[in-house]
């Protein structure tokens, strides 16, 4: 069974790019264009991993991350953002993100980050 990944990004172009990359890596993909929809889709679709944009209309990505982790402490989340400041990375690490993907997306980096996060999630489930 292919791992399901939820892409959360208010940019249709970013969602399409990530979908194309993930589908070449043999992942099943579901999408949400904002934070509130992401929370709904997460609990309806039960994805194995969430790729989450930080800067979105309505609900900031960090707030979505915190809410996801409150509702499901085992939620696996990788942040996708153009903001590469170390303070931003520390904030998302502290909130429980398992990785960080820079925009614009590079296929190999996306697939490596997804694979690493899924492996880390599998390791934490067995401990």
Where are these regions (language model features)?
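Alpha4 helix (beta4-alpha4-beta5 surface) of REC/receiver domains from two-component response regulators
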Residues: 63, 84-101, 112
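Receiver (REC) domain switch/active-site region of two-component response regulators
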Residues: 106
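Acidic catalytic/metal-coordinating carboxylates
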Residues: 34-37, 60-63
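Conserved phosphotransfer cores of two-component systems
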Residues: 43-45, 67-74, 95
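Two-component/phosphorelay signaling modules centered on CheY-like receiver
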Residues: 12-30, 95, 117
